[in-house]
Amino acid sequence: MAALSSATKRLGRLIPHSSVLFVCDVQEVFRGLTFQLPTVIHGTNTMVSAAKLLNVPVVVTTQYGSRLGSTVSEISKNLEDAPDVKVFDKMKFSMLVPEVERHLTTNMPQRKSVLLCGIETHVCVLQTCLDLLDKGYDVHVVSDAVSSSTSYNRSMALERIRQSGAYITSVESAIFQLANDAGNPEFKSISKLIKEHLKVQNGFDTGARI
């Protein structure tokens, strides 16, 4: 069993019962200030929907919410019926503040794979990733659900994250990894979710800024 667990970690497998979804600081104030934010919101929302289908808990943070506002309405609305979601406000850039770490260790100690979405890739997402890696978590950064103020900062940060040992994935790939099998009871719903997701253009596939 120990050998299997080690191999699973090395390969970066995503399994619902050992995973948690992190949504980092996708706040109203960043509309118009973040490269391809509509794509980030859409991708993050698809991840939230998949988490609800597959019983993956969600951890959401806001950065200095009293000044910078709440999570964008599209995501907040989708989270309303999530069975396991906790929202934390913070001042530190990393999501792994003591309250979040306590929530993880107390309520979900078996969940050691973190799917990470949000902004900004070169600041809060990067620092969250490094802190999680330092604590022994596998980190899967969902590349079409993270961004920065500029395309350059996003690209640089993804490379830095890769250098540190995290996995870079996509919305579609991560969800199919979690589902794992066309025999999954939720596969029809997952397939429909992916089809709906792909109807919206991925802004990171183009040079246009939205």
From Swiss-Prot:
Localization, UniProt: Secreted; Host cytoplasm; Host nucleus
Phenotype caused by lack of the gene: Leads to a significant reduction in virulence on soybean seedling and increases the concentrations of both free salicylate and its glucoside (SAG) by about 3-fold in soybean seedling.
Domain of life: Eukaryota
Principal EC category: hydrolase
Any single GO CC term annotated in Swiss-Prot or TrEMBL for this entry: host cell nucleus
SUPFAM superfamilies (UniProt xref): Isochorismatase-like hydrolases
Annotated disulfide bonds: none
Residues annotated as the enzyme's active site: D25, K90, C124
One GO MF term: isochorismatase activity
Record-listed E.C. numbers: 3.3.2.1
Gene3D superfamilies, A to Z: Isochorismatase-like
Catalytic activity: isochorismate + H2O = (2S,3S)-2,3-dihydroxy-2,3-dihydrobenzoate + pyruvate
InterPro entries: Isochorismatase-like_dom (IPR000868), Isochorismatase-like_sf (IPR036380), Isochorismatase_domain (IPR050993)
Keyword set, alphabetical order: Host cytoplasm, Host nucleus, Hydrolase, Secreted, Virulence
Induction: Expression is up-regulated during the infection stages.
UniProt similarity note: Belongs to the isochorismatase family.
Listed PANTHER family: HYDROLASE (PTHR14119), ISOCHORISMATASE DOMAIN-CONTAINING PROTEIN 2 (PTHR14119:SF3)
Annotated function: Secreted isochorismatase required for full virulence of P.sojae. Suppresses salicylate-mediated innate immunity of the host by disrupting the plant salicylate metabolism pathway via hydrolysis of its isochorismate precursor.
The protein's name in its UniProt record: Secreted isochorismatase effector Isc1
Organism: Phytophthora sojae (strain P6497)
Organism lineage string: Eukaryota, Sar, Stramenopiles, Oomycota, Peronosporales
